[in-house]
């Protein structure tokens, strides 16, 4: 009886050893971490099933790739002329998308969702206001539209992780501050005024997602959705695209979750934004911080450098890594070992 038992032991031991020595590349050799091409545009998926690849695409738009799943957090690939170009077109981002999660119904967060969803068959998730507009385009089948309110029980399962909708809050920046900021940016701009073609381009984009006065008001408190990502191996992430005050739903979530490994944390409004952004940092205690809605504008608003914010994060969470990645740069995290790699 001992020989068969020994044989079984050896088979199990060899199997475990083979898994431990699986020929996965290190992060600095992982193909998905060495390219600027998003997976949605035909770039490679990570070879290591434990590796998460994240790319900033502008404003609050991020691509998240894990195993065979490609998710867009917000979907506005086309950019207004006063944002730095990401050198991508909406059509290019239709090679592989499994789901689109929309934060709220302002155009720069969702105006390309119908096109991308139609061409990829991706599920499109968002609040009632955002999904009302998406449905009105007639490009997405009702079966692929998921309307959420973020009040619990709205979870979407993928290969190795799930995404839960959580009620958020849109940022509230005083009008007089915004007026002064725009005037200052206009006064010191080095890029010159927008060309007629740029003005036409921006007019088209700005008119794509019309909202009523009632919708604009409801969007602030009821129409902003954050998302909690729970991985099967225990890795946790949180995404929100607007820097409003933290909500009861977000606080209830963190009473259960404790802290997150990766936080997509909102930063909008320059120096005024640091206190509210730090409210998110204190609540979620992320090990890695990636900002949302932080990129600067030409002839519209003053730049919002993340240096002062990152210093505040370091002062309270010295072990946290606060990163403001360049457009399309791969940020790779091994969700088991927590190793972090930032590409070029």
Positions of PLM-derived features:
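Bacterial N-terminal signal peptides
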Residues: 5-15
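Boundary at the C-terminal end of the N-terminal hydrophobic targeting segment
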Residues: 18-22
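Flexible, acidic/histidine-containing loops and adjacent segments that form or flank the divalent-metal
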Residues: 27, 147-226, 232-235, 321-344
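Pre-active-site segment of Zn-dependent metallo-hydrolases
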Residues: 33-49, 57, 61-106, 111-118, ...
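Active-site neighborhood of phospho(di)ester-bond hydrolases with catalytic His/Asp-centered motifs
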Residues: 59, 72-76, 96-106, 125-128, ...
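Active-site environment of divalent metal-dependent phosphoester hydrolases
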Residues: 80, 106-111, 131-134, 152-154, ...
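Active-site-proximal loop/helix segments of hydrolase catalytic cores
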Residues: 84-85, 203-283
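Binuclear metal-ion centers of metallo-dependent hydrolases, dominated by the metallo-beta-lactamase
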Residues: 131, 136-159, 278, 282-344
């Amino acid at each position: 009886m001992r020989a068969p038992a020994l044989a079984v032991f050896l088979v199990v031991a060899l199997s475990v050893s083979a898994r431990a020595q699986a020929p996965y590349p290190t992060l600095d050799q992982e193909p998905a971490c060495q390219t600027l091409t998003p997976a949605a545009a035909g770039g490679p998926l990570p070879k290591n099933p434990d590796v998460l690849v994240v790319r900033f695409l502008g404003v609050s738009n991020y691509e998240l790739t894990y195993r065979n799943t490609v998710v867009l957090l917000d979907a506005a690939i086309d950019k207004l002329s006063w944002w730095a170009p990401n050198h991508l077109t909406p059509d290019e981002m239709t090679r592989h998308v499994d789901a689109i999660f929309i934060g709220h119904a302002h155009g720069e967060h969702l105006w390309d969702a119908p096109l991308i969803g139609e061409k990829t068959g991706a599920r499109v998730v968002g609040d009632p206001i955002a999904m009302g507009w998406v449905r009105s385009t007639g490009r997405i089948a009702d079966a692929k539209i998921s309307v959420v309110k973020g009040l619990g029980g709205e979870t979407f399962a993928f290969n190795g992780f799930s995404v839960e909708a959580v009620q958020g809050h849109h940022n509230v920046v005083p009008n007089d501050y915004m007026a002064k900021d725009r005037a200052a940016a206009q006064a010191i701009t080095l890029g010159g005024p927008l060309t007629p073609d740029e003005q036409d381009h921006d007019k088209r984009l700005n008119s794509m997602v019309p909202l009523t006065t009632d919708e604009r008001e409801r969007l602030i408190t009821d129409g902003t959705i954050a998302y909690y990502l729970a991985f099967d191996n225990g890795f946790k992430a949180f995404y929100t695209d607007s820097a409003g005050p933290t909500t009861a739903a977000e606080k209830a979530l963190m009473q259960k979750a404790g802290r997150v490994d990766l936080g997509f944390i909102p930063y909008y409004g320059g120096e005024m934004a640091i206190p509210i952004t730090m409210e998110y940092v204190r609540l979620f205690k992320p090990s890695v911080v990636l900002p949302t809605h932080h990129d600067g504008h030409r002839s519209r608003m003053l730049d919002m450098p993340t240096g002062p914010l990152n210093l505040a994060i370091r002062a309270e969470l010295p072990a946290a890594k606060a990163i403001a990645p360049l457009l399309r740069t791969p940020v790779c995290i091994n969700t088991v070992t927590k190793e972090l790699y930032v590409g070029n």
